[in-house]
Amino acid sequence: METFDTNVLVRLVVQDDADQCARAERSWRSAVRSSGVFLPVVALVELVWVLRVAYKLDRASVAATLRRLISSEGVTLERKDVLHAALDRYAAGLADFSDYVILETGRSVGAVPLRTFDARLAQTAEVELVP
């Protein structure tokens, strides 16, 4: 199995640099054919940030892009349960994807509520503002 860095994932989904896109696609296809692709949580959190901040994609587009990527053939996810739950919350919520990953990681080990200073995130069940 091969791990792909955020910058390669960006090229795969944004398609904004012809040379790097072609190289990324060849590498991805090769990995899928041979041993598969591993996507770490942090790479996907970074990908969402890049798509939102650098490419100005809206929440719905980012969520759809991430769903396509993580459901691709040959992909293995770190903490699949956490990522799917965080993505569901992100698609319907107000907070950042990274916040929902933190929440769902805590939930997965029974560590709730999540304490935060983020008022948007605090509108989520199992999240409380620090008084």
What are these regions, as identified by a protein language model?
Residues 1, 103-131:
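Acidic, PIN/NYN-like endoribonuclease modules and their adjacent C-terminal/linker elements
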Residues 1-39, 54-61, 67, 131:
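Short, well-structured N-terminal submotif of metal-dependent ribonuclease cores
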Residues 11-13, 50, 124-125:
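Residues that scaffold the ATP/ADP-binding catalytic core of kinase and kinase-like folds
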Residues 13, 28-29, 70, 84-87, ...:
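Regular secondary-structure segments
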Residues 33-34, 72, 93, 124:
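Structured helix-beta-strand junction loops
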Residues 48-52, 67, 87:
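Amphipathic alpha-helical segments within well-ordered protein domains
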Residues 74-115:
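Active-site neighborhoods of divalent-metal-dependent phosphate/nucleic-acid chemistry enzymes
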